[in-house]
Amino acid sequence: MDLYDDDGESAQSEKVDVPSEESTIAGPETDIPAETIEENVPEVEENTLLEEDSLVDVDSPRPSQQRSKPSKSKRKRKRSSSGESSAAEPEIDAGAKVKGPLSNTNKEINVGTEFQAKIADLNLNDKACNEDRDDQDELIWNTPETIDDEKLEAFIRESSDRYLIPIDRALYILTINNFNFDSAIAEVARRNELKDVWTDQEITLFENCYQIFGKNFSQIRSALCHRSLQSIVQFYYESKKRVKYLNFVNSKCDDSSSSEETETPSPYPEAIFESMCDNCGEKAENMQINNAMNRPECRACLIYFNQTGVPRPTSLRLVLAERIRNQVSCPDNMKEYMKDFDKLSAQATGSTFQKRIIVKDQCVEYIIDVDKIPSSSCTENGNVGETSSPSAQKTEIQSESDGSGPLIWRHKKTVCMEEIEVLADDSRRKMFEACQHGSKVDIKLVASWKNDMTNLRKRVEQTYYDPDLNPTYLFSHDRVHYSQDWTQLERSQVIRCFNMYGAHFEHIADVIGTKTPDQVYQFYLENQKAIDAADEEFLADMKNPERLADMEEEEDSI
């Protein structure tokens, strides 16, 4: 570059490297011959050069005063067939070193070991490789070589059938317990998994909502607001293998096509199709009339009403509040028992049966093995398996079933179940004892006593009296006066009536006929101890068959 001073003379000159057309076209240094490059250089017409020379201004400064810009020539790629291009390409030696970039002008792919990246070998024992990994996989099950296949099958059958544990979960529990079947089955027995059970109405409502909203679970939850989003998604993937939801989508398309063919004009105004739902208050595109409620509702509210018969709740808070209002409270007579709920719901140990055993000193006649202590579990009935207590020895599963019928498992007994069974046994024993005492009573003697009491009552209550016997009673209007003195016969009769009727003074006065209820009551107060002693003696005589025979002989002699 030339520099000029104030007088216009050249003060210093530098040489500036100006790239020429050949250097621009050549590009990166490669082993490609120059003949190939010259074929791609466009031809410049001479007329264009003459026009440029004619447009040069005479008064313009010298060329040395202007910076020369590198001339850019446009490349013109010639289109040729694949055969011509392959013929024109020069042969490149495979061993020659390529000095240009990997992607050269010929668009060749460099293949070979020298073009590959060098990656160090993976060392599995290096802890630095696994320190920053949070998504490490965990081994659930790997069948060992020394495990007993029969015990393994028995463990899987017991875990899945009896405790309703998934097989993969049971195998994982066995793995973390170092393949110890006893400790693994003990841990499985402590696990109680609560399953989310869906009713038929909820399943139908979910299927209808799936036709409308597809896999938009948040919209489906608006119809099943008492269900959480996690529960809905879990139910979808659990039932996905059993129910092909693609059929619901196809049926939706078929219904839409058929509805277009048989479309009938709606009698309702078009304004309701753009209004808000009267139930949930949300705006929907396709509003429908609920004929039962006589109001426009969205499709979700209408489906819920058709399936359940009640309006769809608009929020989970209202549903929970309604459940709390309708919740059945514990009765007052059961609150005392609910204080010991944890104690009664504990696993049975057989201590209740141990307490009710009558020892030898309390027995009149002691017989061995009459009242054995049953186990703390349900007894077998056909193919019903017995669930023994933790202290008892566990039996093999194969010995409980003969293969001809299903193996039914029952839950272990609780303390409450033992208490109920003890009460049932005691009530049956009391009923048997009452039947035995009833068989000792002479039914004919009791019937004769009742007959005598009936005759006495009839004699007192009869309205016809002989004038020769009671003339003063018929013709006198004065009140009948009863004597205050008690004869020996009246005393024996009233004590006997107290044994039969208890403290019913009016009935006793009617049976005796010569005393009023007040007189009988006064006699009871004066002789209460003697009446109670006679009552106890009467009950003892009723229980003693020998005494009953003596009483019959005394009555016969009388």
From Swiss-Prot:
Residues 69-80 have a biased composition (Basic residues). Keywords: DNA-binding, Metal-binding, Nucleus, Repeat, Repressor, Transcription, Transcription regulation, Zinc, Zinc-finger. It holds the Pfam family ELM2. Residues 1-106, 378-406 are annotated as: Disordered. Residues 36-56 have a biased composition (Acidic residues). It is found in: Nucleus. Belongs to the CoREST family. It comes from Caenorhabditis elegans. The keyword Phosphoprotein does not apply. Residues 107-192 form the ELM2 domain. Disruption phenotype: Loss of function results in a suppression of sel-12 mutant phenotypes, possibly by up-regulating hop-1 expression. Double knockout with lin-35 results in defects in growth, vulval morphogenesis, somatic gonad development and fertility. Probably part of a large repressor complex. Interacts with histone demethylase spr-5/lsd-1. One of its GO terms (molecular function) is sequence-specific DNA binding. InterPro entries: ELM2_dom, Homeodomain-like_sf, SANT/Myb, SANT_dom, Trans_reg/Corepressor, Znf_GATA. GO terms for cellular component: histone deacetylase complex; transcription regulator complex. The keyword DNA repair does not apply. Residues 378-402 have a biased composition (Polar residues). A zinc finger (GATA-type) spans 271-325. This is REST corepressor spr-1. GO terms for biological process: negative regulation of DNA-templated transcription; regulation of transcription by RNA polymerase II. Probable corepressor protein, which probably participates in the transcriptional repression of the presenilin protein hop-1. Probably acts via the formation of a multiprotein complex that deacetylates and demethylates specific sites on histones. Acts redundantly with the transcriptional repressor lin-35 to play a role in vulval morphogenesis and promote germline proliferation. Residues 193-244, 481-532 form the SANT domain.
